[in-house]
Amino acid sequence: MADQEPSVPGPPADLEWPPESGDSGAPTSRTIAGWVKWVIAAGVVVVVVALAGTIIRVPYDTFAPGGTLNLESRVAVKDVKSYPGRGALLLLFVRERTHVNLWSLLQAKLDSDIDIVKQDKVTGGTSQRYADQQAVCDMTQSQNSARVAALRELGYKVPTSPGLDVIGLPPTYSYKTADGVVKNIKLPAYNLLRPCDEIVGADGHTLEQNADLSKIVKSHKPGTSVALRIARDGQEQTVEVPVVAVPGTRLVGVSLARRYKVPVRIDIDTSDISGPSAGLAMTLAIIDQLTPGDLTGGKNIAVTGTIDPNGNVGEIGALEQKAVAARAAGAKVFIVPACAKDSGRAACLKDIAAAKKRVGGDVLVAPVSTLAQALQVLREAGGAPVRSSSSA
């Protein structure tokens, strides 16, 4: 069969073309009416498509390069001598859009700076409301860890205090049976507690560490409840949380962090930015405020990575988008988390390689695993040395 030329849409069949004209050469009323109908129909289609692209939401989130905050001017140390720096320690953030519409998804596909991620991968199977609460809590916990890590690095004693902070509430516990079937058990705390609730006590007992609550939970039979005394929004209340049995143990389904009595008042203003990835940057900014000299050497230093109270640096997401922000801010050094030796190492190394490509050869990309390593990077880049507990 011979190839056929593709058909090209045209005006309606009842519209004469070329248009008939009267003796004067002007279009007839029939011709004008036909064209008006065609234009209206085409306009309606355009409007419907535009509205559909705006209204219809898809299960994807997008991550685009955001900007930076100079933490040197956003960390304030009270009641002790401080030493403002001349350079900049840059917190990097990305712009996340959740549950985007079709037009936003198309725009993201055409922009190499924007990353597209399935929404359930971002939320971890939780609701968007919970994910938003968790992100705000992550920033609060990140600030707490930054204070502790920085002060310990400088030789301060930072003791723990009673109570435990809720830092995660997984909705389910998953495991494989002997025959390979995946089972999911719903965890009750997910619907009863909130991220960043403080657990003051359980069954009338005070709590100092995670093991204290675990011991109390294991003393209960499945189906009975633990009475958790919690503090939320400045008010205390008791919440009855059922205990569930999972292979080998019993749970209520809560991840916890210890609380600390910080000996120095340190205020940190990160505006409305949420998430855990600013931990290392905040830690370095606190250290720079509390030590003479300039930790940055007068340069713009971009930093990303989580921090724990012991100074360990953890991996983060959207590294490539943060690299774009670091380059735009004129950073000379970009400190990033080193890759752990686990199943995600290959993907992590790929992300670091992409970040190096984004910032170009003029920016040093320095992977670190600990706070001490980050301080070493800054010393080698011309920053003032810090007399710390790890370097003593």
Regions found by a protein language model. Name each.
Residues 52-126, 369, 379-392:
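Extracytoplasmic low-complexity, Pro/Thr/Ser/Ala/Gly-rich segments
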Residues 155-195, 385-391:
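PDZ/PDZ-like groove recognition
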Residues 182-212, 216, 323, 330-343:
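Conserved PDZ fold ligand-binding element
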Residues 96, 129-141, 168-172, 184-186, ...:
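Second-shell loop/turn segments in exported
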Residues 289-291, 301, 309-341:
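Glycine- and Gly-Pro-enriched alpha-helical subdomains that act as flexible
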Residues 214-256, 354-373, 377-380, 389:
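PDZ-domain C-terminal substructure recognizer with occasional recognition of PDZ-binding tails
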Residues 37-55:
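Hydrophobic membrane-insertion alpha-helices, especially the h-region
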Residues 232-285, 385-392:
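C-terminal, low-ordered peptide segments at domain boundaries
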